[in-house]
């Protein structure tokens, strides 16, 4: 019974940084989506001063749609990449 607890507790020994790096290697498009989201939000907030005649609510909606579009695109590419690796790349013996 102690071996079961040892196996389940081994995931808690892993630090946050090493866990993030391991997950990033398993699914590389998730950190790309997160970085793109952060970059689009930062750029949108930077451009908030010089938005011109545009209402703030419209500017924020455009920023949200762009960030969501980037994340959905990264998720779609990641799904396609995973499907490629699982079904087509491993077929060659």
UniProtKB/Swiss-Prot annotation:
It comes from the Eukaryota. The keyword Ligase does not apply. Keywords: Acetylation, Electron transport, Membrane, Mitochondrion, Mitochondrion inner membrane, Phosphoprotein, Respiratory chain, Transmembrane, Transmembrane helix, Transport. The modification N-acetylserine is found at residue 2. The keyword Cell membrane does not apply. It is found in: Mitochondrion membrane; Mitochondrion inner membrane. The modification Phosphoserine is found at residue 8. GO terms for biological process: cellular response to glucose starvation; cellular response to hypoxia; mitochondrial respirasome assembly; negative regulation of apoptotic process; negative regulation of release of cytochrome c from mitochondria. Residues 2-93 form the HIG1 domain. InterPro entries: Hypoxia_induced_domain (IPR007667), RCF1 (IPR050355). Associates with cytochrome c oxidase (COX, complex IV); proposed complex component. Also associates with respiratory chain supercomplexes. Proposed subunit of cytochrome c oxidase (COX, complex IV), which is the terminal component of the mitochondrial respiratory chain that catalyzes the reduction of oxygen to water. May play a role in the assembly of respiratory supercomplexes. This is HIG1 domain family member 1A, mitochondrial.
């Amino acid at each position: 019974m102690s071996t079961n607890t040892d196996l389940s507790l081994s995931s808690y020994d892993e630090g946050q940084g090493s866990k993030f790096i391991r997950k990033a290697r398993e699914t590389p498009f998730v950190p790309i989506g997160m970085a793109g989201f952060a970059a689009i939000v930062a750029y949108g907030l930077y451009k908030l001063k010089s938005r011109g005649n545009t209402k703030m609510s419209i500017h924020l909606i455009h920023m949200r749609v762009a960030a969501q579009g980037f994340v959905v695109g990264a998720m779609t590419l990641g799904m396609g990449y995973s499907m490629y690796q699982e079904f087509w790349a491993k077929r060659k013996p």
